[in-house]
């Protein structure tokens, strides 16, 4: 999701609802605010995709699995067995930036937390996930703030 949707749709964007990952406080893992801060410092803007936390965790999971099973021979060539890699992925558990990461036997490794957001005005300068568009579902509770 990006501010371009507001510019492209103009006034028609007001009231438009979209599903997107829940990035409100408490919905992601404890490391999420640090990821957003470091990303913003590096690139000059916050991530525009709600899937950045899951992508980051997927990369961490892959690196942990590779570190666990990679074998290097005498010539310096590194080998990664497919079955060993798959088996390693299924055993790794960690607290990711998107929340707890642990793969089930079908390869689902994270619990996706969707939310519904609604655009409240047509001014592109007001774009900020959680503000415009604002989260309308699930309701934010005091314990998740």
PLM segments and residue spans:
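Extracytosolic ligand-binding ectodomains
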Residues: 1-145
């Amino acid at each position: 999701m990006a501010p371009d949707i507001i510019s492209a749709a103009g006034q028609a964007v007001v009231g438009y609802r979209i599903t997107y990952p829940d990035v409100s406080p408490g919905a992601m893992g404890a490391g999420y605010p640090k990821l957003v801060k470091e990303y913003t410092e590096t690139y000059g803007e916050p991530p525009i995709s709600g899937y950045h936390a899951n992508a980051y965790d997927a990369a961490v999971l892959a690196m942990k699995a590779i570190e666990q099973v990679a074998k290097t021979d005498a010539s310096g060539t590194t080998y990664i067995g497919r079955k060993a890699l798959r088996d390693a992925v299924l055993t790794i558990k960690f607290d990711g930036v998107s929340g707890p990461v642990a793969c089930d036997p079908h390869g689902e490794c994270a619990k996706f937390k969707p939310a519904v957001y609604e655009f409240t005005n047509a001014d592109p300068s007001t774009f900020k996930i959680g503000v415009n568009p604002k989260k309308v579902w699930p309701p934010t509770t005091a314990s998740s703030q």
